[in-house]
């Protein structure tokens, strides 16, 4: 198999291999890297996944992208080390399941990508004898997952930006207590401000002497590992070649794009439900063909999804033959008919989010947090317009309910237990910087962090 190449969604940069795409984060033309072609699995190959543990499925999926870049035995070891935690699938009712992606080091689905990315980054930097600074904007969980995964990785410095007033206490403490090679910066603004500052830094001529990369879902290294758990879920809940419905809480659309990648690789998918909160730019676009960013983004209980312009829409538009630039301008419309056939999207209010937590607890004794509740309610909206039939469905729960103790307590009357993987961080002293949502100040901060002499 030849080495797979990745192209920019803006189409003005040369195609590169996975190593180059991963280390760069964003293409020089400000587009996002995406596979030129999707490697495929045969139905027989996918059928064998039912007998395999998670780390082995991860190896088989990711090896399709790392051929010629990472030796197979090295990749297998990386997968075994990265995925040493369970991936529970709980039955809600007949053929409808809840997949909890909250068992990793920071109790978030972001651990699945961050743990693998850190190992890939570490290997590539050692091979090249290089140093790198990773800039990451977080709306809640990415920062903690990236900070923990890259903590004390030689050659890597991590700088995380988060909206000061829009993350929960536990989300904040999971990233502000690490120190060493990790710095966190509270921004007096929205997540979109944080993300815009990171993107500007990549394109800033004054910072070209600083080797920068990103661990946000603009980095292809985040996206590819997130395709694995869709293969895993299907292998546990579906018969051979049986299509699955996935309902996914969607903010920056990296999680949802993992399902799209899996489908493009051959996984039978009946429908992808992209459930959003009050930041409803995508369902409106899907309905009307007109895209308008939400600025500023709207606050919701599902705070990790408070994204007014999802970066990964550029990749989704590209899959369907269109082109969206980094500002959200659509230069070529995608095939909307095909997109509507494959994807259903709906906006869930905070009131319905609260109702979903209560409904699932009262009826099924399963505890959701706000993001999982958005996915549950999105699934309900889809089944109101299309029949599920006998197809299996998987609702994605992206964070541990203990990250949202106040919200959960208001609904069910008690606070969820804090998992052991979170307890230690919550007891440590915090250390973070704070600044206005001002790019010039952020540039000065970066220059001070990276003196040239």
Residue ranges of model-derived segments:
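PLP-dependent amino-acid enzyme catalytic core
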Residues: 1-453
């Amino acid at each position: 198999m030849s080495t797979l190449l990745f192209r920019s969604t803006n189409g003005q940069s040369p195609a590169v291999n996975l190593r180059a795409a991963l280390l760069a984060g964003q293409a020089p033309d400000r587009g996002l890297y995406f596979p030129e072609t999707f490697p495929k699995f045969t139905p027989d190959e996918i059928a064998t996944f039912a007998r395999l543990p998670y780390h082995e499925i991860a190896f088989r999926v990711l090896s399709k992208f790392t051929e010629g870049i990472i030796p197979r035995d090295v990749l297998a070891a990386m997968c075994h080390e990265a995925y040493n935690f369970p991936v529970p699938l709980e039955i809600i009712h007949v053929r409808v399941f809840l997949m909890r992606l909250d068992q990793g080091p920071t109790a978030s689905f972001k651990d699945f990508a961050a743990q693998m990315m850190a190992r890939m980054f570490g290997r590539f930097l050692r091979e090249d004898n290089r140093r790198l600074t990773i800039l990451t904007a977080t709306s809640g969980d990415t920062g903690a997952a990236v900070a923990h995964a890259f903590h004390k990785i030689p050659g890597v410095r991590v700088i995380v930006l988060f909206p000061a007033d829009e993350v929960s206490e536990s989300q904040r403490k999971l990233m502000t207590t690490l120190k060493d090679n990790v710095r966190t910066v509270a921004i007096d603004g929205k997540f979109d401000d944080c993300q815009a500052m990171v993107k500007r830094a990549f394109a800033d001529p004054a910072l070209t002497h600083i080797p920068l990369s990103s661990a946000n879902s603009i980095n292809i290294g985040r996206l590819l590992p997130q395709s694995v758990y869709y293969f895993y879920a299907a292998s546990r809940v579906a018969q051979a070649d049986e299509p699955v419905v996935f309902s996914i809480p969607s903010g920056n659309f990296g999680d949802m794009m993992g399902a799209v990648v899996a489908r493009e690789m051959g996984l039978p998918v009946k429908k992808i439900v992209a459930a959003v909160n009050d930041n409803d730019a995508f369902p409106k676009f899907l309905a009307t063909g007109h895209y308008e960013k939400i600025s500023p983004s709207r606050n919701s209980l599902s705070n990790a999804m408070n994204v007014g312009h999802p970066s990964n829409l550029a990749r989704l538009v590209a899959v369907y033959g269109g082109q969206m630039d980094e500002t959200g301008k659509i230069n070529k419309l995608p095939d909307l008919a095909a997109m509507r056939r494959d994807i259903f999207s709906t906006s869930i209010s905070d009131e319905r989010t609260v109702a979903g937590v209560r409904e699932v607890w009262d009826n099924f004794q399963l505890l959701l947090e706000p993001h999982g509740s958005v996915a549950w309610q999105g699934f309900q909206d889809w089944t109101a317009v299309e029949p599920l039939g006998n197809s299996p469905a998987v609702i994605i729960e992206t964070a541990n309910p203990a990250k949202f103790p106040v919200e959960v307590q208001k609904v069910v009357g008690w606070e969820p237990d804090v998992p052991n993987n979170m307890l230690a961080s919550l007891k440590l002293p915090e250390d973070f910087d704070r600044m206005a949502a001002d790019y010039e100040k952020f540039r000065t901060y970066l220059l001070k962090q990276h003196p040239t002499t």
